[in-house]
Amino acid sequence: AIDLIRQSGGDAQIWKTGHSHMKKRMAEVDAPIAGEMSGHIFIADDFYGFDDALYVAIRVISQMVRTGQSITDYVDTLPIQHATPELHIACADNEKFPFIDRLAAHVKTIYDGKDLTLIDGVRVRTTDGWWLVRASNTEAALVMRAEGNCKDALDRLVKDMEAVLAAAGMNWRIECGLESAVSLS
């Protein structure tokens, strides 16, 4: 989504997950719209942080009527991305943020700063796509995701993420109860 927003002339920014973080950031940068991977979409209509699924649906339908394009036709124009499901790894509340700090310190030694975002966990961007590991704000867990521009790219990203996590002291496949042969793409 970030690449698509930027290609369309928008100023896409990565920020912390969570309703209160999003509302505050929208006000700080005067953003007309914001969204999260969870599907929450925030629209700035007379105030910041208007998060209402029915309202968003009405806005999408209104846009489709204005343009004369069906939502199916619009979705068909979007690039196909390959992504893992959101993985939650049990991690004690008092351990998850220190682990993210250790992971960030390790990742800084591997990746160039322009390929690394440390706003809400550790997000690494490569030519294949991106991967993210962050501490959950709502449960005693780490949350992991990866998205690639093709299946092979996603497989490479997952292997990269796995290697980096192992170097930081975590075999996430064991933690998640997955065997090493399991493909997440």
Task: Give the label of every model feature segment.
Residues A1-S185:
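Phosphate-binding and adjacent anionic-ligand microenvironments
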